[in-house]
Amino acid sequence: VTVQADTVILRMLNPELLANHEKAAAALAGADVAVAAMRTSLASQLLDQQAVQARATSDWRIAEVKNQAYERAHVAGVISALALRESRITEEQQHRRADIERQRVAASRQNMAAQLRAAQARSDEVASTLAIAQQQVAALDVRAGIDGI
């Protein structure tokens, strides 16, 4: 029988190393699934927050249009100064609310990115553990150093 350099000539077994390799492979699969699940969950939360922002912006725009109509009606003497003031206050409140919701969406995006980076870092750590386990298992193989018989 001839062998070439780097041919496996003896395969040793170490049940502990093999078990560690299997555990690391399973942990990596779990970590990857966790990252994907987190990404989906956070994207859904972001969409919910964006829907709230859209509603707040819509409410503000409606209040803005109503306030403009109230201003014209007040100039024409159709509504009181009190009704106009209430309309202005409502518009200001809705504007502030829309701004807050916009800030929340921005904060949600930053939070989402940070959480995903952390989850990916955990996954990368597990991948590193798996790579080490693979190297340890591969080191159990005795290979020919040169071509021979």
Descriptions of predicted regions:
Residues 1-45, 75-83, 149:
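Long, amphipathic coiled-coil "stalk"/hairpin helices in large membrane-associated assemblies
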Residues 19, 23-40, 44, 51, ...:
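Extended amphipathic alpha-helical segments
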Residues 74-75, 138:
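Short polybasic/polar patches that bind polyanions
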Residues 64-67, 81:
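Short, surface-exposed alpha-helical segments at coil->helix boundaries
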